[in-house]
């Protein structure tokens, strides 16, 4: 279990509880997201890359065709279990480690790039950033990426958020807007912020896949009881039945490119 005072008012959550649905419904990054990473000079043939808090390995699997050798690490053994299963099924050659990011131990200049997708907020950044700096080769890249749905631009997303809050009032992952993140203070002296890519994009869903994606979020399956999840899901599916079976939800993607000094 993870608990932080600045996330969900300290309510405990465990991503390992979401793994089955996470594996099935959260591989939703668009092709342009992966192309943006390559355009920043990361994930290409001959490079070694590390993905922190890899979950079920969505990002390294999506980057496989560009030729880099990837390692994925996650605090949850169950997430890593599914990451390995999915990689084996797709023929992806990815190494996986079950470990908190702050406890990883690699040699100096082990990687050309490090990625952290949807997860940087969970880390002890003062501990982790000097380690990432050590692991990166000279001029190496640390990419912090975020992809949030936009509830103020989607009626479905807004109604889904309201239902999450009904069953989990402590959930703090709501109300996201089009905004770019600030450079972490503890990056000063270690990294230069070379690029920040930001754009909106529509992600296609069906009623089933959107329900699964929301169910696998921190506010539901990672933190509620089975009885609470069952009640939420019945109400959520009833809400979705009022809309077409296929629809798009606007998301905002940001990629912050921190280059090792």
Where are these regions (language model features)?
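Conserved class I S-adenosyl-L-methionine
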Residues: 1-44
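Nucleotide donor/acceptor-binding cores
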Residues: 46-47, 109
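Class I SAM-dependent methyltransferase SAM/SAH-binding core
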Residues: 50, 56-103
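A short acidic, Gly/Pro-enriched loop at the edge of an enzyme's catalytic core
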Residues: 102-113
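A short beta-strand submotif of the Rossmann-like class I SAM-dependent methyltransferase core
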Residues: 116-117, 125
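A short, conserved alpha-helix within the catalytic core of class I
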Residues: 123-132
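Conserved catalytic/acceptor-binding region of the Class I
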Residues: 133, 137-203
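Conserved Class I S-adenosyl-L-methionine
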Residues: 182-261
